[in-house]
């Protein structure tokens, strides 16, 4: 689809679940998106970079969202390995 300026734009850009790689459809109102900012240890201020985690409603419905977030943050080095 094109806008008035002639640029190609998408109406809907689907997201994927970070834990299961499922596509999150538009009507999945139980899904959550968490953005964790990187913090400078010297100043305590948020840096320009961040890490985003998306959990679909099916994972949340099973009660596995907290385990998935812990597993993903350990893999990315945000949490320590022996948490």
From Swiss-Prot:
Its main location: cytoplasm. Keywords: Cytoplasm, Endoplasmic reticulum, Ribonucleoprotein, Ribosomal protein. The keyword Protease does not apply. It comes from the Eukaryota. PROSITE patterns: RIBOSOMAL_S21E (PS00996). GO terms for molecular function: structural constituent of ribosome. InterPro entries: Ribosomal_eS21, Ribosomal_eS21_CS, Ribosomal_eS21_sf. One of its GO terms (biological process) is translation. It is found in: Cytoplasm, Cytosol; Cytoplasm; Rough endoplasmic reticulum. GO terms for cellular component: cytosol; ribonucleoprotein complex; ribosome; rough endoplasmic reticulum. Disulfide bonds: none annotated. PANTHER family: 40S RIBOSOMAL PROTEIN S21. Belongs to the eukaryotic ribosomal protein eS21 family. Component of the 40S small ribosomal subunit. This is Small ribosomal subunit protein eS21. It comes from Plutella xylostella (Diamondback moth).
């Amino acid at each position: 689809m094109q806008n008035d300026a002639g640029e190609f734009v998408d109406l809907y850009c689907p997201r994927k679940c970070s834990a299961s790689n499922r596509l999150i459809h538009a009507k999945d109102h139980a899904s959550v998106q968490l953005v964790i900012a990187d913090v400078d240890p010297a100043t305590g201020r948020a840096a320009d970079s961040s890490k985003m985690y998306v959990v679909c409603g099916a994972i949340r419905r099973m009660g596995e969202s907290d385990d998935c977030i812990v597993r993903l943050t350990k893999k990315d080095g945000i949490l320590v390995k022996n948490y």
